[in-house]
Structures are given as structure tokens and as C-alpha cells.
């Protein structure tokens, strides 16, 4: 079994600290808004470029993936977004976790209680649900986000079977990112202030002409939850007991011949980069 895990990096120091294969996510020379999806855009690009093709499992993690999951386990956090996996997952532990669960299509590296993913996000990022609904409508995906109650995957902290990752990108991530950056009205919606508390990187502020984190990354990282639900994906969440399973609406492993949303962008003229 071959597992390929990429770590998304923005500096030399970050690259040097990576346990897994580093990927230099260079700031574009022009204001390409796809970049604002951050790790979700890296997933899209690498799948298009077939980085997953020779692997059984594939993942794109942030350079701080361990810290994010550990910080989310703080008991002072709001319960719905509190990581209930109390053990700090190590790189070796991650590989062993994947090896123990060959039945899973997706393996979440954290464990969160089930909650309405997009409705909760709206309380932190005003306008996120409305914008996501319009993006889905633009790519002909009909789904009531208010009824999406899921034990979620957060921070793009997941590993997937390579064919399942390709299905996710092909069916929802790629078309949504393209719609968000090509349609003038959708672009304006996505560029609104997300209300995220961290300071926007100065070099990005200069390039994109905004002083805040827009909605793009917070929409992108939540799409995996919509996909796993509709595809009937087998998802296992990391837990000190070894793993807790959940399934989408249909208890069937993902097959590239079976589409969660009834179509595949690969069959509609190929990828547009």
C-alpha cells in the first residue's frame, strides 16, 4: 500500500520542518483568486496534475496540521468545533491509522461531534452559507445546506483513497473553485470579509487589494463534508480507541462510475486550469 502525503508550505522554514513531502505554495505574480482557497486549491491543482495517480492514498495537509488539531482539542472551545481526539496524532500514528482502516474512503485526522456544518460556519463567517448555496447552484448542484448535519472533517485534515479524492475534486471542488473565480457576481460574494480573527498576510493584501481573509478558504475546506454525505462515503475519524466510523446517506464505497452529483467534469471536456 502506497500513501502519498503532501504538506503545503509558504516558506523555506516551513519546508524544513515538514515530516511529509513539502509543496512550495508560491504566491502568484498576478491576482489569481484561486490561490485564496489555499490548501483546497493545492488539492485541486495536484489532482489535476495526477500527483495521486501512483498512490493508493493521497492527502494535502497544512504545515501546521498537528498544531491545528491539537489546538482544537482545547476543552475551552465551543463543543461542536472541539476536537474530541485527545491524543496528539503523530506522523507515524497517521500512517498506522490509515493502515488499520482499509475499508475507509476518507480518514479524518480529528473527531468532532455531528452538527450542522454550514449553519454553524455562518455564525463565524457571515455570508458563507448564502455564498456557498449560490456557488452550488452555479455548478448545477442542488443541496439544502441547512440539512447537512455531519460529523465533519475540518482543516482539510484528511487522507483519502486516491480514486475517492479524484472524485471529490472532479465533482465539486474543481467546479466550485472555477465558478468562484470566473463569475463576476460570485467573485464579489467570495471576496467579502470572512471575519476571521488572524491578520491577513501583507503580501497577499497588496496583491489582492483586501486587508482581511475572504470567504474562499472557509468554503473550500467544508465542501468535503457535503461530498462525503452525498457520495455515501465511508469515513473513519481518528480516536484514541483506534477509529470511529460514519457513512454518508448511501452505505456504498465510492466508485468512479457512480457519481454523487450525477456528473463528472472530466467527461465535460477535461480539466480547465
Ranges and model annotations:
Residues 1-273:
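ER/Golgi luminal nucleotide-sugar-dependent glycosyltransferases, focusing on the catalytic module
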Amino acid at each position: 500500500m502506497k500513501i502519498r502525503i503532501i504538506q503545503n508550505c509558504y516558506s523555506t522554514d516551513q519546508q524544513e520542518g515538514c515530516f511529509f513531502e513539502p509543496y512550495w505554495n508560491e504566491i502568484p505574480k498576478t491576482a489569481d483568486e484561486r490561490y485564496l482557497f489555499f490548501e483546497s486549491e493545492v488539492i485541486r491543482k495536484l489532482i489535476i496534475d495526477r500527483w495521486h495517480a501512483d498512490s493508493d492514498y493521497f492527502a494535502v495537509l497544512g504545515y501546521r496540521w498537528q498544531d491545528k488539531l491539537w489546538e482544537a482539542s482545547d476543552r475551552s472551545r465551543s463543543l461542536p468545533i472541539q476536537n474530541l481526539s485527545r491524543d496528539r496524532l503523530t506522523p507515524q500514528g497517521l500512517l498506522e491509522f490509515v493502515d488499520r482502516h482499509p475499508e475507509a474512503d476518507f480518514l479524518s485526522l480529528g473527531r468532532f461531534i455531528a452538527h450542522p456544518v454550514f449553519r454553524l460556519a455562518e455564525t463565524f463567517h457571515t455570508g458563507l452559507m448564502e455564498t456557498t448555496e449560490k456557488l452550488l447552484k452555479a455548478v448545477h448542484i442542488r443541496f439544502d445546506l441547512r440539512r447537512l448535519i455531519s460529523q465533519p472533517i475540518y482543516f482539510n485534515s484528511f487522507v483519502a483513497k486516491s480514486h475517492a479524492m479524484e472524485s471529490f475534486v472532479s465533482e465539486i471542488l474543481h467546479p466550485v473553485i472555477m465558478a468562484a473565480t470566473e463569475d463576476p457576481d460570485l467573485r464579489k460574494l467570495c471576496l467579502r470579509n470572512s471575519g476571521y480573527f488572524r491578520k491577513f498576510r501583507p503580501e497577499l493584501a497588496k496583491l489582492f487589494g483586501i486587508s482581511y481573509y475572504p470567504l474562499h478558504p472557509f468554503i473550500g475546506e467544508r465542501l468535503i463534508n457535503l461530498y462525503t454525505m452525498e457520495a455515501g462515503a465511508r469515513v473513519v475519524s481518528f480516536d484514541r480507541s483506534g477509529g470511529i466510523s460514519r457513512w454518508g446517506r448511501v452505505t456504498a464505497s465510492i466508485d468512479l462510475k457512480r457519481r454523487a452529483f450525477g456528473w463528472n467534469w472530466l467527461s465535460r471536456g477535461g480539466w480547465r486550469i
